[in-house]
């Protein structure tokens, strides 16, 4: 349970072996590649260059096509019959890189693209027909072909008038102008009236002038033949045909949904190919050779050595120099108990390569503190069930895998603390028993202590736990400083406070006094004064003295007081649960009590789950890590097979 030692790996190999070697390094999954840092002035390196071609860009474009097609099929696929949480397929590495899968996926992309294009074309034509139908509907009352044209003596005008114009006023205005004019009213739509005006050509200008006062606008029916009714009938016939074609297209898309698995496998395979291409761009290449540089865990160096022995390659693995530590990637080596705490470390910042792995040191505190704040058997069971479900059903990886493990560990802690405080959804069970049987003697679950009656004891215990964790952090700091050869810093920094705390404890019990004075405490105070001013000079000693006393005392004791939140969250969760149980009990019925209590406790559970995690995280990152943690590390990211949709199993 520590930070894994790294070796800097350098490889010279034949260019013809480069692709195969990268594939096998990806299979091993233990080498992180980096861009070589060789001096460009060295003539021996003039033939080596970093090469970048369009292969990576083309692969990324193909990946986008596969992903787009997969999303389209997800939208078009029928209800998943495998359930809401289908298991991820398990395939071998050979099946992942099977060329046939890629061909099947590419054919699916082409078919889906063609079907999507056809569907879009059908939808566009449907929208066009809808617009045409809406335009023709107001003319249904006119039994005159829309392609009726003017003749030598008769002027034919299709158009619209303002909806405010009355029939009598329009006809009277035309009659005053000429007797050689007739109006046929087709219909109304919105604020317009649709009309057909027939008049003698000699009276055409006069008729137009009369109609202008009523907002007349001419309408053209280019391309339309026959009456509005006949055209709408044709449109409806075409719409029925298009609807059938659209349904057939959607049915074919739904059938293509059966190829989602092939697309997912292909996406995972393309992800690995792109990773190798990105790694390849970090190499230096000449016409016949290549140079590779990276990091490998010392414990896995033998695997890399065995692989390289199969190729015509020269290589070396060296320990990093201290000035290289900031560039060395960090890999944490933890067991099943402490590995889920990577979720906390990832959210904060990785330790430096020459630092210390915080997970095993933090695990007992984080898990116990979380359970102490939640402290409910039902909540613990829910967390435990959720973590087990995620692991067995979803089989997550990365952060989600750590979350599942953390839910299990914190769920166990929450259940245990809930058993000690006698809490199961607060006081749900005793209140339910009282509603069912008012004369019951079951008034509470057995408890070692309860948040409402033992608040002061819990507060003292919280502060004691805080003191224990702070002292643990100080002890780790002492060990690190002694290992680094700065034992004087350990003496004046941590040793001072240990002397003060020991002196206070001895003074309280009356031990270690000399002439009525607490000697150990006085020694600690003198160490505080000297240690804080030992590097200052002149007037700076006074300011350093004031700063040391003020910042040291307030900082140390404020850190301890921060742990009062353990009691506060335990008390808050317990009170909220009991309040909802009381509200449910007021209903007077078992059903009402159960519904109100469960809804309220569900809300309390979700709020506490987030609140306890955030406050626990704060205690670890500020109060605990602040004592010893050296940050600045970069997580180890090797070239490996990392899949999203499938799980890789061993070859038979």
What is the predicted function of each stretch?
Residues 2-8, 16-22, 26-33, 302-652:
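Conserved, carboxylate-rich catalytic/transport cores that coordinate ions
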Residues 1-362, 397-404:
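Long, charged N-terminal accessory/stalk domains
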């Amino acid at each position: 349970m520590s930070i894994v030692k790294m070796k800097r790996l350098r490889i010279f190999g034949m260019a013809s072996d480069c692709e195969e070697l990268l594939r096998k390094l990806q299979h091993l999954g233990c080498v992180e590649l980096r861009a070589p840092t060789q001096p460009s002035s060295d003539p021996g390196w003039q033939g080596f260059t970093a090469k970048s071609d369009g292969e990576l860009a083309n692969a990324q474009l193909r990946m986008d096509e596969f992903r787009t097609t997969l999303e389209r099929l997800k939208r078009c696929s029928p209800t998943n019959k495998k359930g809401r949480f289908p298991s991820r397929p398990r395939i071998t590495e050979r099946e992942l890189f099977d060329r046939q899968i890629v061909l099947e996926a590419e054919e699916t992309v082409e078919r889906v693209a063609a079907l999507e294009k056809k569907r879009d074309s059908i939808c566009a034509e449907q929208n066009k027909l809808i617009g045409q139908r809406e335009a023709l509907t107001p003319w249904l009352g006119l039994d005159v072909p829309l392609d009726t044209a003017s003749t030598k003596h008769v002027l034919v005008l299709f158009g619209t008038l303002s909806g405010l114009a009355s029939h009598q006023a329009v006809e009277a205005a035309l009659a005053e102008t000429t007797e050689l004019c007739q109006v046929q009213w087709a219909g109304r739509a919105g604020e317009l009236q649709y009309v057909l005006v027939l008049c003698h050509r000699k009276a055409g200008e006069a008729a137009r002038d009369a109609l202008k006062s009523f907002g007349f606008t001419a309408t053209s029916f280019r391309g339309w033949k026959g009456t509005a009714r006949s055209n709408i009938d044709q449109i409806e016939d075409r719409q029925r045909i298009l609807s059938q074609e659209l349904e057939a297209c959607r049915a074919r898309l739904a059938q293509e949904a059966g190829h989602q698995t092939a697309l997912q496998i292909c996406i995972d395979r393309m992800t690995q190919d792109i990773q190798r291409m990105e790694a390849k761009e970090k190499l230096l290449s000449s016409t016949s050779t290549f140079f590779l540089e990276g990091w490998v865990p010392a414990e896995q160096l033998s695997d890399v050595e065995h692989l390289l022995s199969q190729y015509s390659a020269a290589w070396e693995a060296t320990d990093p120099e201290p000035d290289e530590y900031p560039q060395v990637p960090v890999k944490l080596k933890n067991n099943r108990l402490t590995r889920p705490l990577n979720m906390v470390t990832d959210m904060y910042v990785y330790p430096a390569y020459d630092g210390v792995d915080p997970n095993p040191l933090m695990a007992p505190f984080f898990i116990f503190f979380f359970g102490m704040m939640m402290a409910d058997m039902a909540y613990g069971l829910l967390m435990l069930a959720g973590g087990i479900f995620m692991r067995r059903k979803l089989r997550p990886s990365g952060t989600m895998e750590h979350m599942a493990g953390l839910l299990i560990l914190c769920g166990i802690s929450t259940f245990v603390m809930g058993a000690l405080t006698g809490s199961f959804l607060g006081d749900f069970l005793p209140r339910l028993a009282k509603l069912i049987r008012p004369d019951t003697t079951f008034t509470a679950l057995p408890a070692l202590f309860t948040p409402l009656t033992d608040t002061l004891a819990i507060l003292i215990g919280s502060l004691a736990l805080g003191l224990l964790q702070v002292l643990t952090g100080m002890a780790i700091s002492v060990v690190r400083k002694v290992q680094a050869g700065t034992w004087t810093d350990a003496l004046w920094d941590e040793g001072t406070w240990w002397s003060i705390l020991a002196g206070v404890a001895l003074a309280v019990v009356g031990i270690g006094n000399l002439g009525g004075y607490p000697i150990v405490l006085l020694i600690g105070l003198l160490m505080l004064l000297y240690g804080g001013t030992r590097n200052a000079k002149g007037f700076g000693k006074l300011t350093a003295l004031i700063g040391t006393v003020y910042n040291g005392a307030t900082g140390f004791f404020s850190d301890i007081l921060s742990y009062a939140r353990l009691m506060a969250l335990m008390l808050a969760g317990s009170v909220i649960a009991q309040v909802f149980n009381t509200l449910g009990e007021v209903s007077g019925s078992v059903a009402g009590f159960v519904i109100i209590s469960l809804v309220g406790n569900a809300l309390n559970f979700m709020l506490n789950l987030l609140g306890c995690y955030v406050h626990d995280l704060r205690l670890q990152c500020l109060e605990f890590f602040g004592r010893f943690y050296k940050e600045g590390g970069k997580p180890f990211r090797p070239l490996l097979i990392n899949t999203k949709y499938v799980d890789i199993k061993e070859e038979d």
